[in-house]
Each structure stands twice: as structure tokens, then as C-alpha cells.
Amino acid sequence: MKLVFRWYGEKHDTVTLEQIRQIPGVEGVVGALFDIPVGEVWPLEEIMKLKETVEKAGLKLEVIESVNVHEDIKLGLPTRDRYIENYKETIRNLAKAGVKVVCYNFMPVFDWMRTDLHKKLPDGSETMEYDHRLIEGVTPDELIKRVKEGSQGFVLPGWEWDRLEKLRETFELYKNVDEEKLFENLVYFLERVIPVCEECDVKLAIHPDDPPWSIFGLPRIITNKENIERMLKAVDSPYNGITFCMGSLGANPENNIPEMIRYFGKMGRIHFAHVRNLKFTGEKSFYETAHPSFCGSHDLFEVMKAFHDIGYEGYIRPDHGRLIWGEKARPGYGLYDRALGATYILGLWEAIDKMKKRYC
């Protein structure tokens, strides 16, 4: 595996490249251009500036998260072809900079959802929580206000305020889009973009829906083994793959995470992975924990063993961490707990590797 660490850039992150460079085993960062409006082409010049900044710190830039998909593409509007052409050009530019994997998602309106960005845990740390009862009791506008107030001035990925200004209008448009129509729109997008990925040797990796069920009546289509497999078969190319986010898929206890890793891993379709843990608190409700197995509801040893069993050589990053030791940072993306998560992942990998060599 290749261990990487998400970084939001000098303008948007409290974590520095120098700090990331000092985390044992981390080879590169997962980056993006956050000032380019969704749907516009990422200029090669700006991509190269980011690459040079990262490489100057002794790290690699081979994974991008995310090149967001314009809402018109998800809705299947007549304007989608222009945005798809822009997406294809962005992939070509990223390939010229040496990028190997592009993460994206196909979630309508909201890229992810939490109901509390600063849940206090008994040890004094802060984490993010999702309580489905609260979703059922508020309007989208009220929830956006709550998230904006809890962001502490940081721009949260997928919650860029310019994207949410037309919220009511966007919700009206989605009244005509059910899960089947959204899936058709995803296939339309992939059929046009994947050939460019093949041409440029850039793998496209869809991120599962977070959480993996419908919210506010919006359709969700990347939530379990069955619909992921359907998506992969619809455009059957090794360049059409997934970002295996165990936190997103693992929010549904019916998803067998190690089994899914083995299944899709043997197909060669896991191009990128997010590893984190969470604790179930009720039906469709959870909060995010530190990475170790005893902290949450998932067995990280079995998760990492599944990756090792398939001979995974792709990219893995520690996902959301708690805010600990008084750190003030973007919710889920401070330095310390994610660094602890990175070393935990690395330690599990080393232990599994040595056990196999010794006893097999």
C-alpha cells in the first residue's frame, strides 16, 4: 500500500506540508484546487504550482480528491455535456502533472452529512456525529445554517457555500430524479469520461455516499456491494473504480467491510481507500472515533488484513480524526489524530505482513 494524507493547501489548511512530511510512512498528499468553481477546467498551470509545492516538501501528489461533478451532470440537464467536456480536460491536465487517481462522488446536493461537528467525548476530544433523528426533524436550510456555524470559518469539502446558495432551486430539480434516473446519469458521465482516463492512464474512483442512505428524500446510489458492482459492470473498465471509504460504507452495519474489500479488491477496482472507525449509537446514527478497533464498532485489524490479503498496492489515507490536544482545525481534519491513525494503519500492516511471512 501507499500511505497518503489529505491536505487542503496553504490557504485552507492548518496542517503544513512540513508536519505531514514528519509522519512515519506517509509518501504523499491527497490534494485539490479548491478555488476553481465546480464544473470549470482546472488550469494546468495551477495544477503544476500545487505539484511543485508538494514535491518541494519531499512528498508526492498522485491522488486528487476531489474533482467535483457539476450538479447539471447529476441532474441530466441539457447543459451537462459542456461540463463533461470540462471534466475530461481537467483529467488530461492532471495526467500531465503525474496524477494517477481522481476521487469523485455522485451525491446530490450534499457531498456528506453530519448533524454535529463538535461532539464532546468523555476524554475531552471533539468529533463529528450523525443522528438521523435530527435529520428527520429539520429542513435542509436549518441544517446548512447549523453546519456553517460549526465549521469555525473553514470551508468544508462538499459544503462550499456558493454551491448551496441555490439550495431550494436544486431541490426542486431533484423532484424529477429518482435512484434509477440518477444511476442513468452516472453511467452517461462515465461512458464519456472513462475513455479519457484510459487514454491518459488516470484511474477514476467514486466515493460511496455518506451516509449510505437517502436524506431529505434525495436519491443515493453508491451505498452497498450490489449497487457498486452494478456501477462497475455498467462501464466495465479497470479505470472505472472506487474509493473504498470504510467509514461511509461502514455506517451501515449490514455492509461487511472486509468481505467487500476482498470482493472488489480481487476485481482490481479499489484505486483508493479511506480508513477510519465509528461507533454506532442507534439506527442510522453514529459518531466518529479514533482509529483503533477498541475505540469503535469496526475491527481495523480485519479491515487491514483484507487489504493485505488482496495484495493491495494502491493508496490509503487515514480518514477523519478527532480534534485532540487543544487543536483548532477543520472538523475531522486536524493533524494529531490523523497522524495517530496513519501510524496505527502502518503498524497493523507491518504486523500482518510479518505474521504471514513467519507462519505461512
Curated annotation (Swiss-Prot):
It catalyses: D-mannonate = 2-dehydro-3-deoxy-D-gluconate + H2O. Belongs to the mannonate dehydratase family. It comes from Thermotoga petrophila (strain ATCC BAA-488 / DSM 13995 / JCM 10881 / RKU-1). The keyword Iron applies. One of its GO terms (molecular function) is mannonate dehydratase activity. Disulfide bonds: none annotated. Pathway: Carbohydrate metabolism; pentose and glucuronate interconversion. It comes from the Bacteria. It holds the Pfam family UxuA. One of its GO terms (biological process) is D-glucuronate catabolic process. This is Mannonate dehydratase. Catalyzes the dehydration of D-mannonate. Its cofactor is Fe(2+); Mn(2+). Keywords: Iron, Lyase, Manganese. Its EC number is 4.2.1.8. PANTHER family: MANNONATE DEHYDRATASE (PTHR30387:SF2).
